Amino acid sequence: MRALLAQNRLVTLCGTGGVGKTRLAIQIASASELRDGLCFVDLAPITESGIVAATAARAVGLPDQPGRSTMDSLRRFIGNRRMLMVLDNCEHLLDACAALVVELLGACPELTILATSREPIGMAGEITWRVPSMSITDEAVELFADRASRVQPGFTIANHNAAAVGEICRRLDGIPLAIEFAAARVRSMSPLEIADGLDDCFRLLAGGVRGAVQRQQTLRASIDWSHALLTETEQILFRRLAPFVGGFDLAAVRAVAAGSDLDPFSVLDQLTLLVDKSLVVADDCQGRTRYRLLETVRRYALEKLGDSGEADVHARHRDYYTALAASLNTPADNDHQRLVARAETEIDNLRAAFAWSRENGHITEALQLASSLQPIWFGRAHLREGLSWFNSILEDQRFHRLAVSTAVRARALADKAMLSTWLATSPVGATDIIAPAQQALAMAREVGDPAALVRALTACGCSSGYNAEAAAPYFAEATDLARAIDDKWTLCQILYWRGVGTCISGDPNALRAAAEECRDLADTIGDRFVSRHCSLWLSLAQMWAGNLTEALELSREITAEAEASNDVPTKVLGLYTQAQVLAYCGASAAHAIAGACIAAATELGGVYQGIGYAAMTYAALAAGDVTAALEASDAARPILRAQPDQVTMHQVLMAQLALAGGDAIAARQFANDAVDATNGWHRMVALTIRARVATARGEPELARDDAHAALACGAELHIYQGMPDAMELLAGLAGEVGSHSEGVRLLGAAAALRQQTRQVRFKIWDAGYQASVTALREAMGDEDFDRAWAEGAALSTDEAIAYAQRGRGERKRPARGWGSLTPTERDVVRLVSEGLSNKDIAKRLFVSPRTVQTHLTHVYAKLGLPSRVQLVDEAARRGSPS
């Protein structure tokens, strides 16, 4: 400010009443070092413009001089003096102040004028500086504490009252005058009671300071003063801004405030005048101007709006923002993200529109608004708020007797069910989640409303839990209907939820296809939230397929995008995926990423916190820190209980932890539950863990069966993440029955697969692995061990799997036909079809040529074929068995 005054002769401090303009002007003036001093002209008590000059003359110590005008006396007195004149409180005398300033600045070349006013004086060369409110986190709190200690000595801000004081300062917008009024109440009220009483702030903050000017005796008087200076048209616009909360733009003002007595084209001019008069604040928000009322000013405007009888202004406000919300459900191509961002910006106005509708019994409109905001509830992590909106009406008996169209109620019930499913307030598939969805479906079918029906079908599919068979018919019908009515957003949600089910399937190929289909549609409508989730599914599919480098790169990319977009749910899931991949890579960074996941998840709560702790469980397990893994797991379990997929996967982790802790019985139970409830990659991992449990319990046959089943599961779906664990288990089991060469070859194949995919063995299994390696090396000797290891490492992944499967043992098979062939016989047929001789086949299978011929003899007998040529022809016709 000193620099401004040094470079400019007229500076005006502007701002709302009570913001501290006068106080700041006095501080600036006191620090002035102008040679001839300063004078302070208090215009607050002056009501007649004709005596402004006389007031200034008295301030500089000039007596009345007969025969000479006051202005002339001032000009002569000030002359060439280097001095500062403060004109305080000019807003009600702008013309007179302007005339005085013109005269004095023109005649007195060394004079500088500092003015305070609720609006600019409006002169050429005037520099306007808006006095901001105090920072509510420090300055305002310090002021409250200072003023409170004056009326209640010993008052301090501590843990028990800090939040309440912060709330007071926030709700009073950091306005010093209002904060001083509030602090004065400490003599008879606690800060918490003061904060609660601010709903009626004008009554609460009515006790001013004796000796202050009248307009600063109470908060109401301060705003009354500004309001009285408005023209009638300005007063009309001012009160019609009252329904807006948090901010608004020009288009919204024109839609809500314009009318027969306020031309839409004049709104901008009138709004600008309200900004000039410090009743409206104008902010630059990323190149766009948004306006807002300070909360105390807005409450005053609400009173004026109520007194005017213009209740329709609230309805127009509600209708404008309801239309904005409705546009979310019908996005043009690639427009969804922009609409969601705009709705997020207007969330306070949307909340106000909903609250006004509910409080005034406009239930249909309130439910429509809540349903239209599903993209916000999901895409911006406002899930609990969305559910609370629906519950505040659907579970309130007062509203049951009010007429609401069946279609609107059906959609509301469906949308509530979807939110409940996501939040998992009960186990997914529970009655209190399914019932609203089924009720919505019955109602939607009754009225034949396609939009309500597609939402209800989607809700039924979602609320079926992770039972793909139960959800499939709902999703199928919903998909067809959404395509028929061109409801792209709902179709995207359907594909999204089907993708969630595919995640549970554990099939990387199916997940990749589902993710790509949903992502493409999401990108078409611009739904980056869903698109990011689909990309995370693709990284998951990469992980299952053993492509850990690609999985890590993609999950990092999506996490960074989510963080930049303030998409916390996707950020949490991205960090979880990263932590999991890093754990399988053996990277120490997994721990830090898991910690970041927990920190981000804490912001959301609920199942996300459970996911964060699950990430830490993976990281700790991989590092061999069983204690830390148990702590993280114990924190995750109760949170994840309502999410079947997460609970099941956590049972796999619990089985590993129990086994590492020596509790094989508990480990077996966890593993059994996981095997029974999972498919695909999840089941492969669960089977491998159960095989470890069986090995630890001295049950080699059970261990062998489960390890082979895990291998078969992975081979069928091309799942390679975790496959080396199954191979190493089979290697150890082979060594125990004397099949040393087979065991070492499997170890070599597993090591090669680990190197190829970058996956490491969790440290908690290292001891068992090293024991198997040591036993096999001792049994074979170094030279034979190394040769067998190299033979296994040279196998391709498919060859290694086939080699491992040959040792599975006999199963019940038909006596004849292709189904009767053993795994080894199938390998022989495949290699014969490739044109290999018996000698070459023997080398590939690590057996003798005579053994190959024996297998062929069995094959000819089982298939009823007389020769090698016919076997090749028949294999080609049927497709070579694998």
Curated annotation (Swiss-Prot):
Q: Name one GO cellular component term.
A: cytosol
User: A GO term (biological process) for this protein?
Assistant: regulation of DNA-templated transcription
Name used for this protein in its record: Putative HTH-type transcriptional regulator Rv0890c
**Cited PROSITE patterns:** HTH_LUXR_1, HTH_LUXR_2
Q: Which CDD domains match?
A: LuxR_C_like (cd06170)
Molecular function via GO = DNA binding
Q: Which residues bind DNA?
A: 838-857
SUPFAM superfamilies xrefs: C-terminal effector domain of the bipartite response regulators, P-loop containing nucleoside triphosphate hydrolases
Limits of the HTH luxR-type domain: 814-879
Keywords from UniProt, A to Z, are: DNA-binding, Transcription, Transcription regulation
Q: Relate the induction remark in this record.
A: Up-regulated 17-fold 7 days after infection of human macrophages.
Q: Which InterPro entries match?
A: P-loop_NTPase, Sig_transdc_resp-reg_C-effctor, TPR-like_helical_dom_sf, Tscrpt_reg_LuxR_C, WH-like_DNA-bd_sf
